[in-house]
Amino acid sequence: PYIYGFELLDLHDYLGQGTALVGILDPFWDSKGYVTPNEWRQFCDETVLLARIKSYCIDRAKNATISIPIEVSHFGRAPLQSVRIHWQLEQQPVTEYTYGEHGKTLTQIVFQPPVLCGTLKQRDYALEKNQSAGCIYLNMEDIELNRVYTLHVSMKVNGRIVENTWPLWIFDSSKLNPVSTPDGSKAESDTHEAVFITSDRFQAETLLNEGKRVLFELPYEDTSYDCPPVRFNPSFWNSQMGPTWARGMGMIIQNAHPAFASFPTTADGGWQWQSLIENVRGLRVEKLGCDCITNLVQPIDEWNRNNKMSLLFECQVGTARLMMTSINLEQDAPQAAALKKSILSYMKSDAFEPQGQVSWKQLSSLFEINDVMKELGAKIDDDSLSACLDGNPQTFVRLTGGYPYSFIIQTPQKHNISGILYMPRQNHREHEGELRSYLIEAWLDGTWKQVQKGKLSSSYEPQRIAFLHDVYTDRIRFTALDTFSAPGKSCFWAMEPDGWYQKEADPDAYPELKGQLPQDIFSASVINLLLAEEEETAVWKKRIKQRKLAHLEDSKKNSKQVLNNLQNVTSEKSATAEIDN
């Protein structure tokens, strides 16, 4: 009674429709090593212990005590009678390293006794789900900071132990200053060197030219389109069957590196990374030369694309030392503040000696203004195409009708334009409407003049079309002559004895398709104007200035709010004192 059950596609990896790593077991029904049978039974058994935990990352500054309701889901042969649940909070084994001239050396693995423990009230449990078993209360003052703990809950059922475990990361944001820092701020140092923190590419370049230590936080919207977003959850099925711009297959972290000395992590990450890598782009480090950097946090791209990327790396730029990240370390989360503090502590130390050498020109290949069309005030003459000007590859436009498709992009003022960036639709496995042949014209001296014509290769990658020469204009006419999915002709999928094939539409050969043939299609996710170098630099500086002004306004508002809160607290204390008197 009351059992709802569940359904799995398969227990092992599926071998049809491309490689689909959806199974608990591999294609040969062997363990992948991801989970043991005992771990599987913790959440998939006739009796399961459950804990309602709001977050695996806990900020002690905001939570003096944590309450965790415990529940029992039981569908055994008979109800449970007089069962007592035991719990304990255990510190996970700490791996201690020493760092010297010859790198890191494993010192020891330290196992700690339980930090807290207790027992819940004895109860009976029916054949039902989500039955309340009581509540665990954790006093945060008894728990050491910047550590990962395991909450272990167990009970004895019919002679066997039923148990479940959950990881908990404990931080304290009040002890992790600064949480947010303005561009170019100087992090105080105990050594002769200070660390400068910035998200301003020009300021970063200046500081590096001066030989400084720089933490460069590259904003999402300033990152090259060659650098796709990463994802905490793995890709579903595979990117051949269900392509997306963001793909993920886990992470590799150099967890023994001193940059993580006060930020607990395993080599394959953990739940404390989930919010850190949401809305984050993976930096394509093959553009820099993978041997030139030390890749501290590497997201694993899905194997059909297999980009070599990084979320955090260190290198030398001339005589300067650079730590570069695309992770938003300024977000309001205790794990972000803890990671930032751990990185800064390392950067201030003598251990911060990056080995690889990278030029600023190489680093610049990671930068691109995503919303350049918004910055320019660009408009398109067909409202149905406006989404391709939003700079977001995860939206797209789709036109049907017949080739060629032409549209005009216009800006309020004239600009020196050097080319166009076209990014195809990212989520269609048949590359529907992907541009092949094109014609680009500029409005010059009162007439349309050709500035480029050619063909593109079929790819999900951004395609940058350079003009024959820079043009000074306020209007560009873009014409799609044909696409890869149907080069100039309608097509359809047909079943043949040995499989499915995409064929050019021939109504005489397939009369049943008359009146049902698909129309010629053009699609795009992003179309951006590429500016000449001086124009692009001016736009960069304008947006950075606007960002700093916005940050300053936010700081003023936050300071005012803090002051108001202090005044309210003071008023309440005064009122309480008057009442007491």
Identify the meaning behind each predicted range.
Residues 223-224, 237-335, 351-357, 366-368, ...:
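Catalytic beta-strand/loop cores that center a nucleophilic Ser/Cys/Thr
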Residues 1-91, 95-102:
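Substrate-binding clefts and catalytic carboxylate motifs of secreted carbohydrate-active enzymes
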Residues 95-144:
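Intrinsically disordered, low-complexity Pro/Gly/Ser/Thr-rich segments with frequent PxxP/GP/PP motifs
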Residues 160-178:
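Short beta-strand elements
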Residues 361-417, 425-438, 444-447, 453-461, ...:
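Disordered, acidic Ser/Thr/Pro-rich linker "stalks" and the adjacent N-terminal cap
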Residues 479-486:
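Short beta-strand-plus-loop segments that form exposed binding edges in beta-rich domains
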Residues 190-238, 319, 343-346, 581:
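Short alpha-beta junction capping motif
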